[in-house]
Amino acid sequence: MNLSNHFLIAMPDMEDAFFSQSVVYICKHDEDGALGIAINKPSPITMDMIFSATGKNIPMRMQHDSVMMGGPVQVERGYVVHTPIGNWQSSIGVSDNIALTSSRDVIENISREGAVDKALISIGYSSWSKGQLERELADNAWLTVPADEHILFDIPYEHRYAAAFAKLGIDPLALFSGAGHA
């Protein structure tokens, strides 16, 4: 099972402070573990802070976007999920059209017309060790669904949890993850 380019959707009763009601975009999943970016948890960092550090202007299309808190790991670093893949340093190709890049050069080029079509900027990332995500899935902590670029880039972050559930055709209020456990 490879969940790269999928969303993890936290079950409604997840009690973890960070992951409660999270949607995580899985960027890499292999035998060594998984890496993803939470796409619906805003951070205290602003787009202005990100772009002023590079000396570039915020692109008009991103002025109202929020910087996401991608996860609890390496929160001092920035990560960008973007289209198209491009030729950036420190990139992981997630799909034919989407990459995760952790190098500053992608931020510096976002304001250039045509360099990056769509981008989700985050600080930190989410990580699972070998077998950890599979155990959490077996414990009914998460649902999975193939990723949707519209949810990832176009829907406001506060609506992404409901939109991911809607992609499954499920009302999150009707779920109880303890089903089947005595």
Swiss-Prot record:
Family annotation (InterPro entries): AlgH-like
GO cellular component terms given for this protein: cytosol
Entries under Pfam families matching the protein: DUF179 (PF02622)
Family statement: Belongs to the UPF0301 (AlgH) family.
NCBIfam families noted in UniProt: PRK00228.1-1
Protein name (database record): UPF0301 protein NMB1336
Organism: Neisseria meningitidis serogroup B (strain ATCC BAA-335 / MC58)
